[in-house]
Amino acid sequence: MKSYSQLLKDNNTLGKSYKQQSPDTLSAFMQLHKAAMAPGELDLKTKEMIALGIAIAARCDGCIAAHVFAALKAGSTQAELVEVIDVAVLMGGGPSLTYGIQALGAIEEFAAESQ
């Protein structure tokens, strides 16, 4: 079984390397991320749950790790995130079920680490 905590750490490390090699692109993406996730009509918790659902449907392990971690940090409960998985499965079918189950593993891993 993969460690989502380790995946998140690895992506952060590789992101630093990418920033050195392509600073303009990463900077522009981070500005977009900051703007999209800024509180507005939707709070950060809600936006992270939306991002997690999309990450599951898009089958992106690194995105799942990042958005599970961020959603829990923003105050999402495990029960709320399971409902996010449910909606992602509805929209993405069998492949989303497979990645939704992986997301549940990430939820359980990060929740256990925070206790």
Which residues does each PLM region occupy?
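Acidic, glycine/proline-rich low-complexity segments that act as flexible tails and inter-domain linkers
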Residues: 1-46, 98-115
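A ubiquitous short alpha-helical element
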Residues: 13-21, 51-55, 72
